[in-house]
C-alpha cells in the first residue's frame, strides 16, 4: 500500500484531520515559506501525532546543527532536505533522511546518502506537476516519494505510473492557500482505496 505524506501543516485542526484520515507522514516546513512553522510550534503540534505516524521536518540547504536541533526539539522521525546537501549531512543522524530532487528535464538522479529520495517539481510547493516522462526510477537504490502538483484527481495515475513508496502533497490539499480538511480526507482516501476503484 502506497504511503501518504501530508506536508505544510501548521494548525491543530489540520494535523488532527490528517492523522484521523490515515496519513502515514506529517510534514512541518521549517524553511521560509507561507507554510513555515517554528520549532516551538511544531513541537506543540507533534504532541497530537501518534507514534505510528511519522513526523518529517522540511529544510532548504540546512546545516547539520540546524537538523540536529530540530530533531531534538520536535522529536522528528525524518528530515527532508531541499537545495544544497553537504556530503556528510546525513551521516549518523539520529533519524532517517529524505533528499528532495527537482525533476527539471535532465533526468539526473543524484547519488545520495539519504534513506529516501523525493522527486518534486522544479518549483516546490507551486502546485505544478513535473513531466512524469522525464523521470526514470528504474534501479533506484532507495525507496522514493513522488511530489509536485499532486491532488485527488491525479494521484492514482501517479501511483500507477511510478509505483512509489509514498506520495507527498501540500498545495493539492489547500483552498485559497489554507489546508482544506475535506481535501485532505479525499486525497488520503483516494490513495488508500483508489487503485482498486479505477481498475
Swiss-Prot record:
Species of the source: Streptococcus pneumoniae serotype 2 (strain D39 / NCTC 7466)
Assigned EC number: 5.3.1.24
Alphabetical list of HAMAP family matching this protein: PRAI
Database matches in PANTHER family: N-(5'-PHOSPHORIBOSYL)ANTHRANILATE ISOMERASE
UniProt-listed NCBIfam families: PRK01222.1-7
GO biological process terms on file: L-tryptophan biosynthetic process
Pfam families on file: PRAI (PF00697)
A molecular-function term among this protein's GO annotations: phosphoribosylanthranilate isomerase activity
Protein name: N-(5'-phosphoribosyl)anthranilate isomerase
Pathway: Amino-acid biosynthesis; L-tryptophan biosynthesis; L-tryptophan from chorismate: step 3/5
Protein family according to the UniProt entry: Belongs to the TrpF family.
Source organism phylogeny: Bacteria, Bacillati, Bacillota, Bacilli, Lactobacillales
UniProt catalytic activity: N-(5-phospho-beta-D-ribosyl)anthranilate = 1-(2-carboxyphenylamino)-1-deoxy-D-ribulose 5-phosphate
Record SUPFAM superfamilies: Ribulose-phoshate binding barrel (SSF51366)
Domain of life: Bacteria
InterPro entries assigned to the protein according to its UniProt record, in alphabetical order: Aldolase_TIM, PRAI_dom, RibuloseP-bd_barrel, TrpF_fam
Annotated keywords: Amino-acid biosynthesis, Aromatic amino acid biosynthesis, Isomerase, Tryptophan biosynthesis
Cysteine-cysteine disulfides: none
Record has Transferase as a keyword: no
Amino acid at each position: 500500500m502506497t504511503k501518504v505524506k501530508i506536508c505544510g501543516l501548521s494548525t491543530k485542526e489540520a494535523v488532527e484531520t490528517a492523522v484521523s484520515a490515515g496519513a502515514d507522514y506529517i510534514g512541518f516546513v521549517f524553511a521560509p515559506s507561507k507554510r513555515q512553522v517554528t520549532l516551538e510550534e511544531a513541537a506543540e503540534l507533534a504532541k497530537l501525532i501518534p507514534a505510528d505516524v511519522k513526523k518529517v521536518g522540511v529544510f532548504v540547504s540546512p546545516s547539520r546543527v540546524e537538523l540536529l536541533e530540530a530533531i531534538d526539539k520536535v522529536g522528528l522521525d525524518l528530515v527532508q532536505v531541499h537545495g544544497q546537501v553537504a556530503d556528510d549531512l546525513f551521516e549518523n543522524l539520529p533519524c532517517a533522511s529524505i533528499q528532495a530532487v527537482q525533476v527539471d528535464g535532465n533526468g539526473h538522479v543524484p547519488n545520495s546518502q539519504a534513506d529516501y529520495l523525493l522527486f518534486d517539481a522544479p518549483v516546490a510547493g507551486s502546485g505544478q506537476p513535473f513531466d512524469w516522462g522525464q523521470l526514470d526510477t528504474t534501479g533506484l537504490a532507495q525507496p522514493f516519494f513522488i511530489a509536485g502538483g499532486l491532488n485527488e484527481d491525479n494521484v492514482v495515475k501517479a501511483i500507477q505510473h511510478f509505483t512509489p513508496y509514498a506520495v507527498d502533497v501540500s498545495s493539492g490539499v489547500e483552498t485559497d492557500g489554507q489546508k482544506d480538511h475535506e481535501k485532505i480526507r479525499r486525497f488520503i482516501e483516494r490513495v488508500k482505496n483508489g487503485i482498486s476503484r479505477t481498475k
